[in-house]
């Protein structure tokens, strides 16, 4: 879609009027001018009367337009973004406004529209009852259909076995290697309670399937239960694998054939003849996933062309109503079918759609554009609009469009389509469906923190919407040919009576899914004389191979197996028919009486804002597919773009301006974002003095008040989201989606820490450290910066914030927000500058009581060494919380879905230009699928747009500066020189290519390595390394990953639970991700932080973090927090019991030492190692947080009482103690019970520091403690923290001896969310 800039001369007064009018409606002048032209043209084209122009314009209208001479103007940020905002007609604006409207508003509007008049309601109920009764009483379908329905009925999604069947169906047929197929079958079948299903179903097939899922490949009619039970177990074991593989494969293919009309279009057309003879019609759908590459899109295009030729010939002139048609999925025709890539969609996808439509016209067969996810609805309407006005298609009524009744926008979409049909002088075919992406729409809205759902949360509301929409469609027969796709007897009966008895061919039709709806519609399609209703039904018929069938099959299994579906309920003989065919309007009214209002959302589906329950609200996101949100954002970006931001020190006292240096946009050297300067030595000194003075004042502020201030800051930050987005885009090179996520994370941190302090802290018992230095990175200049400061402030500390020198402007805004929220001046201070100067001066100062650092492992080690000899007033070591990088891997086996893997790899490796500490660095692919996966990954990389992130189209922005770019490119060059295959790609156009030269861009890069060890250090940018592994060498691969010493994030893609358990159980990694991307940890949902070289802990956004920022708290403080959080979900403490066994032995042994025995019992009560907790999060995801013991704790004491105190603490968490090999310790060990002594290891005193250990407990004097801290800090490798105590002290902090593990599992990976689908 080419664009031209046309200049118009305006006087200053008119220009001001436009600006004022635009700002009044929160839009840009650019948008207003475009909208005005659009509306004027609209009226002109519709021959409406046009308003008279004021006299002063008449002369101007006759002026000849002068060409605008190009000028080298200063760079204007976000102008291109503003130009991408689309003008909207009134009806289109109404659609957008209804996107996420409150459910109560939407439902109450629908009720009257959907209500049937009493006579129609009575007739509809009677007919529905007859249809349902006949359906239930008819002899079970024979052959394949009956078998499959029996299976699905017996193994519903609420059973473990039903879910196992779904997982098998989703993965089995695509796995290329036998070993992984066997492992999947064993995994899914061995854990099921299959015996409980034996004999429950009257269907012989179901019982046979239960007995090993057709393990012999044929049906057996007699069973001996005892023998079969044994044989089932044997089959599940090794010996039966070939048999069971063959049987399960057959069962899965059988299920596939039930829902697919044919593997090829020719086969499908042949198979359709039988039902066509009974009066059915067909619409064919070519199966497959959405295209991710240009090659995928081309293959689908060819497939659609061939299908149209074949269907057209088979139609043989029957026409669009009587003959077969085709349904096309737009996401299959283009790899970037989304609002962000609007221009590409119009320039590249539209011509493909047009050529397919012209081909369909040539044969006069109907072509339906299928409905997809909610964020694609409006772009599909734009494509449809354009198609309807094509001169070559004038007067042809075969253009079809699918609308979804579960969307709140649906009634308004119908209004628009009716208007479009009228304007384009045609009759449109409109298929009304319920909607097939319900679970994923709920999940997406929750994850993105949007204001509501685009869909109804209760199925009965969708049923009401369907009736209201059906009435609207039937009301305009001259403009709309309605196609009612439903399997619900009441809906069918209602439509039959609403449409009236005087049916004529071409008035409307019903539709059903192949393999699901035929039994119902065999009562409808056919002559009245034969007892039928004489109404046509078109079968939606999928065509494709077993491999392409998977996603579609799981969707059907979900719909069939969901206990809310009509197909499932009709087969449930215990459900009264009256209930099954109830009028949905009456059902909603009944609910309204119980709940006090119509349209109350489902109680089990909280609004995204309320996702975390009462204690904390979810941060608000911004929908970048919503035209109104984009226009508002554009307006804010333009109005803030000319502001020259400043970053200078913020102290309690005013500071001088000093000499400022420009801050340059890394993507566009012409864009000076603002000005900044470094804090001077005297300013740093003043700030330190202020922090010391203000610390007692802030600590004396009640925790609830501190919390309220942080909550206020969260609200202010959310209010200023749009201007913060602009700053993040320009200063840090963030794309819009990254910038939104960053502001949200900062807001989440404020809410999370505020909530914990509000509920659990008391100034009498919880005492802060004092002045704390926060050193934050440039890659998350608002989120991590705010997170560190929020935690330190929440705990009652004064804060000295040293942001990264590359991103001081964002930091200055963050501080301004905190001060505005009520943090007193001097309690939080900003000291911009370099680490070597400002950072060094801060951390070297004895007044600093704690250091929080996020950055490189090397700098963290230096910091630890710098503060090692310093102790606080209580004689404790100064804490360092360090979060550093990682050599993060993702393991992918052959059971994973390649399309899903590629999407997650792109996000994990290249989002944020790879500049996340959690980013994927090494992709480990099982040999069997490596080539196939890499081919698709390379194709998908070539579709990514790299460029200025100030455009909506940009996927990948710049790296932070020229130094970073040089380091990354040096690494790529080194790998090339070594002969490693290097692939680089991004979608290129001339504008982008020019930008790549001037900004600091690095093209997404793929480098194939020979083994994992070849990568020696983290490469912080858009560079992904690939290693291949043999399925039998998975254990060795995990060992190699652990051997790197890093342990931040790890991903695994597999459908095999045993593999998930193996990887997550043996990887020494802080954050683990299963069947999803491995970036974007959410505060309180996936607490974030690594182990080993990747960080010291505790995890940010987790329950332990604030306790590390206190100098003193009660022994049970952590347990108070955990007990409060545990009220929502049960705790899994199985492992804890096992870990505590040695401590129990020590407790018994200490019978004659009452003080030790009491301490042992106290530690046992406090111990949390071996506990696993479920954390709140979005649907379709399972997030757990587990506390495990550190492996080995160095215990240093020269007194028996202290040595035993240390040992009790170590045993309480299940760790091993490392003792000095001397007479004192050997003698003590001899006296201990065997179970306790087994947990102690020895090393010579002179070699202690060379031993592996990951925590230290010390009892003794402060001089000795300093020496120990210095020696521990001088070691190579991971930073180890030291707990130091005076002799006789017993208040050891158990949480310092835990390792935290976060595990996030995408439970909807197999194609849908079974638990959400079954809630009703």
From Swiss-Prot:
Gene Ontology MF term list: 1-pyrroline-5-carboxylate dehydrogenase activity; core promoter sequence-specific DNA binding; DNA-binding transcription repressor activity; ligand-modulated transcription factor activity; proline binding; proline dehydrogenase activity; sequence-specific DNA binding
Gene Ontology terms: cellular component: cytoplasmic side of membrane; cytoplasmic side of plasma membrane
Organism name: Salmonella typhimurium (strain LT2 / SGSC1412 / ATCC 700720)
Region entry Aldehyde dehydrogenase, spans: 653-1119
Record's catalysed reaction(s): L-proline + a quinone = (S)-1-pyrroline-5-carboxylate + a quinol + H(+); L-glutamate 5-semialdehyde + NAD(+) + H2O = L-glutamate + NADH + 2 H(+)
Positions of disulphide bridges: none
CDD domains cross-referenced by the UniProt entry: ALDH_PutA-P5CDH, RHH_CopAso-like
EC number per UniProt: 1.5.5.2, 1.2.1.88
Functional summary from the UniProt entry: Oxidizes proline to glutamate for use as a carbon and nitrogen source and also function as a transcriptional repressor of the put operon.
Alphabetized InterPro entries for the sequence: Ald_DH/histidinol_DH (IPR016161), Ald_DH_C (IPR016163), Ald_DH_CS_CYS (IPR016160), Ald_DH_CS_GLU (IPR029510), Ald_DH_N (IPR016162), Aldehyde_DH_dom (IPR015590), Arc_rbn_hlx_hlx (IPR013321), Bifunct_PutA (IPR025703)
Pfam families linked: Aldedh, Pro_dh, Pro_dh-DNA_bdg, PRODH, PutA_1st
Keyword annotations from UniProtKB, A to Z: DNA-binding, FAD, Flavoprotein, Multifunctional enzyme, NAD, Oxidoreductase, Proline metabolism, Repressor, Transcription, Transcription regulation
GO biological process, any: proline catabolic process
The protein, known as: Bifunctional protein PutA
Keyword Transcription attributed: yes
């Amino acid at each position: 879609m080419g664009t031209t800039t046309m200049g118009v001369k305006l006087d200053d007064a008119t220009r001001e009027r436009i600006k004022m009018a635009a700002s009044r409606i929160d839009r840009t002048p650019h948008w207003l001018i475009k909208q005005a032209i659009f509306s004027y043209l609209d009226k002109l084209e519709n021959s409406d009367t046009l308003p008279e122009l004021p006299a002063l314009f008449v002369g101007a209208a006759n002026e000849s337009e002068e060409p605008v001479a190009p000028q080298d103007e200063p760079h204007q940020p976000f102008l291109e973004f503003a130009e991408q905002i689309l003008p909207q007609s009134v009806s289109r604006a109404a659609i957008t406004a209804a996107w996420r409207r409150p459910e109560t508003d939407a439902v109450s509007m629908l009720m009257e529209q959907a209500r049937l008049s009493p006579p129609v309601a009575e007739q509809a109920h009677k007919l529905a009852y007859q249809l349902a009764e006949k359906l239930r009483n008819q002899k079970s379908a024979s052959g394949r259909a009956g078998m499959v329905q029996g299976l699905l009925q017996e193994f519903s999604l609420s059973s473990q076995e039903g879910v196992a069947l779904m997982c098998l169906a989703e993965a089995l047929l695509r796995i290329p290697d036998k070993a992984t197929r066997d492992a999947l079958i064993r995994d899914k079948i061995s854990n099921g309670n299959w015996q409980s299903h034996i004999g429950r179903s009257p269907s012989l097939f179901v019982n046979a399937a239960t007995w090993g899922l057709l393990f012999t490949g044929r049906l057996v009619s007699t069973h001996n239960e005892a023998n079969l039970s044994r044989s089932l177990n044997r089959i599940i074991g090794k010996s039966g694998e070939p048999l069971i593989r063959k049987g399960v494969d057959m069962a899965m293919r059988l299920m596939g054939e039930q829902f697919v009309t044919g593997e090829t279009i020719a086969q499908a057309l042949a198979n359709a003849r039988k039902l066509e003879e009974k009066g059915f019609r067909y619409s064919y759908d070519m199966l497959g996933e959405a295209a991710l590459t240009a090659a995928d899109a081309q293959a689908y295009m060819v497939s659609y062309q061939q299908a149209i030729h074949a269907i057209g010939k088979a139609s043989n002139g029957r026409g669009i109503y009587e003959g077969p048609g085709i349904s096309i999925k737009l996401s299959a025709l283009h790899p970037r079918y989304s609002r962000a890539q609007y221009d590409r969609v119009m320039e590249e996808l539209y011509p493909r759609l047009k050529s397919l439509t012209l081909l369909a016209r040539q044969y006069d067969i109907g072509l339906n554009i299928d409905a997809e996810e909610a964020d694609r609805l409006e772009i599909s309407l734009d494509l449809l609009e354009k198609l309807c006005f094509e001169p070559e298609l004038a007067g042809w009524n075969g253009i079809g469009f699918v609308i979804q009744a579960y969307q709140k926008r649906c009634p308004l979409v119908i209004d628009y389509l009716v208007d479009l049909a009228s304007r384009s002088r045609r009759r449109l075919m409109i298929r009304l469906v319920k909607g097939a992406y319900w679970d994923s729409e709920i999940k997406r809205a929750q994850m993105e923190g949007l204001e509501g759902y685009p869909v109804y949360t209760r199925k009965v509301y969708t049923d009401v919407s369907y009736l209201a929409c059906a009435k609207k469609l039937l009301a305009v027969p001259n403009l709309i040919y309605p196609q009612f796709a439903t399997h619900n007897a009441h809906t069918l009966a209602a439509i039959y009576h609403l449409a009236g008895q005087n049916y004529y061919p071409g008035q409307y039709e019903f539709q059903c899914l192949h393999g699901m709806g035929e039994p119902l519609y065999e009562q409808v399609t056919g002559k009245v004389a034969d007892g039928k209703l004489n109404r046509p039904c078109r079968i939606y018929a999928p065509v494709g191979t077993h491999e392409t069938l998977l996603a579609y099959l799981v969707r059907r299994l979900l719909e069939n197996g969901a206990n809310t579906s009509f197909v499932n309920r009709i087969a449930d003989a215990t459900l009264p028919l009256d209930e099954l065919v109830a009028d949905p309007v009456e059902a909603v009214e009944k609910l309204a009486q119980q709940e006090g209002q119509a349209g109350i959302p489902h109680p089990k589906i909280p609004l995204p804002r309320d996702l975390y329950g009462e204690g904390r609200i979810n941060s608000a996101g911004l929908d970048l597919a919503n035209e109104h949100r984009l226009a508002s954002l554009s307006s804010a970006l333009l109005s803030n773009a000319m502001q020259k931001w400043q970053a200078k020190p913020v102290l309690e006292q005013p500071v001088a301006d000093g000499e400022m240096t420009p801050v340059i946009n890394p993507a566009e050297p012409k864009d000076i974002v603002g000005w900044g300067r470094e804090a001077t030595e005297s300013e740093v000194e003043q700030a330190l003095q202020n922090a010391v003075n203000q610390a007692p004042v802030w600590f004396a502020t009640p925790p609830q008040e501190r919390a309220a201030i942080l909550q206020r800051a969260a609200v202010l930050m959310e209010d200023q989201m749009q201007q913060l987005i602009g700053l993040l885009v320009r200063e840090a090179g963030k794309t819009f989606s990254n910038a939104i996520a960053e502001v949200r994370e900062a807001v989440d941190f404020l809410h999370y820490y505020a909530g914990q302090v509000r509920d659990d802290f008391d100034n009498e018992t919880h005492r802060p450290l004092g002045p704390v230095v926060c050193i934050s990175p440039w890659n998350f200049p608002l989120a991590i910066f705010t997170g560190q400061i929020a935690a330190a402030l929440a705990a009652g500390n004064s804060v000295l914030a040293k942001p990264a020198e590359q991103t001081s402007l964002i930091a200055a805004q963050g501080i301004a927000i905190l001060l505005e929220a009520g943090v007193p001046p001097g309690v939080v201070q900003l000291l911009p500058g370099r680490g070597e100067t400002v950072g060094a001066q801060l951390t070297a100062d004895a007044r600093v009581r704690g250091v929080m650092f996020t950055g490189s492992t090397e700098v963290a080690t230096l910091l630890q060494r710098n503060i090692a000899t310093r102790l606080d007033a209580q004689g404790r070591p100064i804490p360092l919380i360090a979060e550093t990088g990682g050599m993060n891997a993702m393991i992918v086996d052959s059971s994973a879905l390649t399309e899903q893997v590629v999407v997650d790899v792109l996000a994990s490796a290249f989002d944020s230009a790879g500049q996340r500490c959690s980013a994927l660095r090494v992709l480990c692919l099982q040999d069997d699928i490596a080539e196939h996966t890499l081919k698709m990954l390379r194709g998908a990389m070539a579709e990514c747009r790299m460029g200025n992130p100030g455009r909506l189209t940009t996927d990948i922005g710049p790296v932070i500066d020229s130094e970073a770019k040089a380091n990354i490119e040096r690494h790529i060059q080194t790998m090339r020189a070594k002969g490693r295959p290097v692939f680089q790609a991004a979608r290129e156009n001339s504008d982008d290519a020019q930008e790549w030269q001037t900004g600091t861009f690095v093209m997404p890069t793929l480098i194939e390595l020979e083994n994992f060890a070849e990568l020696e250090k983290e490469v912080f940018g858009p560079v992904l390394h690939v290693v291949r592994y043999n399925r039998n060498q998975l254990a060795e691969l995990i060992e190699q990953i652990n051997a790197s010493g890093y342990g931040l994030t790890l991903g695994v893609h597999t459908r095999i639970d045993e593999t998930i358990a193996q990887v997550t159980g043996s990887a020494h990694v802080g954050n683990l991700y299963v069947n999803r991307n491995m970036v974007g940890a959410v505060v309180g949902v996936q607490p974030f932080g690594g182990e080993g070289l990747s960080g010291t802990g505790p995890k940010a956004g987790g329950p332990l973090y604030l306790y590390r920022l206190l100098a003193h708290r009660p022994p049970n403080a952590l347990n108070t927090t955990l007990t409060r959080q545990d009220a929502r979900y049960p705790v899994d403490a199985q492992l804890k019991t096992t870990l505590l066994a040695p401590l129990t032995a020590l407790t018994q042994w200490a019978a004659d030492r009452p003080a030790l025995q009491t301490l042992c019992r106290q530690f046992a009560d406090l111990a949390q190692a071996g506990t696993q907790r479920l954390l709140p999060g979005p649907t379709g995801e399972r997030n757990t947080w587990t506390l495990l013991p550190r492996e080995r704790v160095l215990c240093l004491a020269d007194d028996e009482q202290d040595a035993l105190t240390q040992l009790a603490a170590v045993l309480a968490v299940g760790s091993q103690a490392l003792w000095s090999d001397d007479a004192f310790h050997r003698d003590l060990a001899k006296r201990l019970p065997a179970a306790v002594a087994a947990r102690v290891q020895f090393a010579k005193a002179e070699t202690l520091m060379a031993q592996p250990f990951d925590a230290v407990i010390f009892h003794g004097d402060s001089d000795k403690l300093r020496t120990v801290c210095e020696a521990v800090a001088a070691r190579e490798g991971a930073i180890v923290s030291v707990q130091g105590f005076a002799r006789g002290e017993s208040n050891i902090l158990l949480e310092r001896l835990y390792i935290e593990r976060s595990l996030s599992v995408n439970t909807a990976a197999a194609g849908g969310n079974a638990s959400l689908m079954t809630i009703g």
